[in-house]
């Protein structure tokens, strides 16, 4: 197997919003950066595999609230270049934006699988990844490594202290529902409106029942639809279910769609709705949160 070696000042794992911002920030401060992404596409949850919207329009109570800095610059670049208004155009706009950073090099389809530490075990010396594009292994060496993978793959491979799962009660003790939510899965769906009614019958293989979901997840979906019908909507599962870790995107989306079309307060309005598309991958809460020198709380 072919083996390559890369040296840089910083290695960033994951090219979602956090990874892109970290890599671009470091490159603009003068560091040489290697950005690793296991998938063939940029964007993470806003990429064309997961298809979450970049920004939920109207999701804030403050009319003029917006992100500034690199996120604002990124969004402006997407709005300017994504003339198609779809995820393919968005991914192209992100790629063009990142390629403009001379000190940043992107490695797509590069899966991290090994971490080498120093003799005392308190510092990462190198990471090893398999690259489909380069057809072999790549050793990445740098003084600093940033884990933006979403699943904590670098942190877990390096045996950094941390925890898995979702523990809202740790910081939200005042929340009445905090202890009830132990698992979160999410997908996205795109809705269009037809000129004529379209009936829907739930497939027999879908085991989830939307009424078993947590109340907050059901309300979030209805509020999103009340703001605007056509477009992309986030669908979450916060309730109890068998084989929670194996909840598929199709099960989640079709259970929500069955509820909307046949039993929800919006059933009459939903007669002409069509499910145009949904994300093939499901995001869940079973990631790894490393315990660092600083911990961000909900406050």
PLM ranges: what are they?
Residues 4-16:
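Beta1/beta-strand and adjacent pyrophosphate-binding region of the FAD-binding site
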Residues 7-10, 29-32, 102-105, 138, ...:
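Loop/turn elements at helix/coil->beta-strand transitions in domains of secreted/extracellular proteins
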Residues 25, 31-32, 36-118, 163, ...:
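Conserved N-terminal/central alpha/beta ligand/cofactor-binding core
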Residues 45, 121-124, 132-144, 148-299:
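Flavin (FAD/FMN)-binding glycine-rich loop and adjacent Rossmann-like elements that form
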Residues 22, 82-143, 263-264, 290, ...:
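Structural core of flavin- and non-heme-iron oxidoreductases
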Residues 13-16, 36-39, 130, 148-150:
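Active-site-proximal beta-strand/loop segments in catalytic clefts of secreted hydrolases
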Residues 19:
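N-terminal Rossmann-fold NAD(P) dinucleotide-binding loop
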């Amino acid at each position: 197997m072919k083996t390559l070696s890369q040296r840089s000042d910083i290695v960033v794992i994951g090219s979602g919003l956090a990874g892109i911002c970290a890599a671009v920030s470091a490159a603009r401060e003068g560091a040489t950066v290697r950005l690793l992404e296991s998938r063939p596409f940029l964007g993470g949850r806003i990429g064309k595999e997961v298809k979450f919207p970049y920004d939920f329009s109207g999701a804030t109570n403050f009319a003029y609230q917006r992100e500034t800095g690199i996120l604002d610059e990124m969004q402006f670049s997407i709005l300017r270049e994504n003339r198609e208004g779809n995820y393919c155009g968005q991914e192209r706009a992100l790629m063009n934006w990142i390629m403009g950073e001379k000190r940043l090099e992107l490695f797509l389809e590069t899966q991290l699988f090994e971490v080498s530490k120093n003799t005392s075990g308190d510092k990462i010396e190198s990471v090893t990844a398999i690259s489909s594009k380069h057809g072999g292994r790549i050793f990445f060496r740098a003084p600093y490594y940033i884990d933006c993978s979403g699943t904590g793959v670098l942190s877990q491979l390096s045996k950094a202290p941390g925890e898995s799962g979702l523990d809202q009660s740790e910081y939200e003790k005042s929340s009445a529902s905090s202890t009830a939510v132990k698992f979160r899965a999410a997908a996205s769906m795109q809705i269009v409106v037809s000129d004529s009614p379209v009936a829907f019958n739930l497939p027999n293989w879908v085991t989830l029942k939307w009424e078993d979901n947590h109340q907050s997840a059901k309300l979030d979906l209805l509020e999103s639809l009340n703001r605007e019908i056509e477009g992309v909507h986030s669908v979450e599962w916060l309730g109890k279910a068998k084989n929670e870790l194996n909840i598929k995107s199709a099960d989640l989306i079709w259970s929500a769609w069955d509820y909307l079309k046949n039993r929800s307060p919006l059933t009459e309005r939903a007669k002409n709705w069509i499910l145009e598309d949904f994300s093939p991958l499901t995001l869940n809460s079973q990631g790894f949160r490393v315990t660092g020198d600083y911990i961000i709380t909900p406050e």
